[in-house]
């Protein structure tokens, strides 16, 4: 992991939120949910990378969010639920066979991801630039 890795992940998170908005606006609800998840994923990857922690499984990152952020009192339970919601909806968007993500769910996933980005930045504002509006 290079010194620039956390910032690169942060930039990917910001890009993914922007992409999720574009997909939502154009009716790509499954893709919007997936990009929202990856926005949260990259933001959290950036946060944990600053501690020298890298996860090779999505489930390990989700466990770390609940154990090291929520249960440790750094984040509210709502933020943990936001991440789990994004995880679950990504599964529908990427792998669902008989179910699709609808517009409301996609918008909710984007809002959840954005709250996660803001919370990550609030923990370490010197490391990450502000989350753009939109």
Regions found by a protein language model. Name each.
Residues 1-134:
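Terminal alpha-helical segments
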């Amino acid at each position: 992991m290079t010194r620039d890795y956390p910032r690169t992940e942060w930039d990917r998170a910001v890009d993914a939120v922007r992409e999720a908005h574009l997909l939502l606006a154009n009716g790509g609800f499954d893709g919007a949910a997936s990009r929202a998840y990856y926005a949260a994923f990259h933001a959290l990857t950036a946060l944990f990378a600053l501690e020298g922690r890298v996860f090779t499984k999505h489930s390990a990152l989700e466990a770390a969010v609940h154990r090291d952020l929520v249960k440790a009192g750094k984040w509210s339970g709502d933020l943990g639920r936001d991440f789990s919601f994004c995880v679950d909806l990504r599964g529908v968007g990427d792998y669902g066979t008989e179910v699709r993500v609808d517009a409301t769910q996609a918008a909710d996933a984007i809002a959840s991801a954005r709250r996660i980005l803001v919370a990550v930045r609030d923990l370490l504002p010197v490391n990450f630039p502000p989350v753009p509006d939109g």
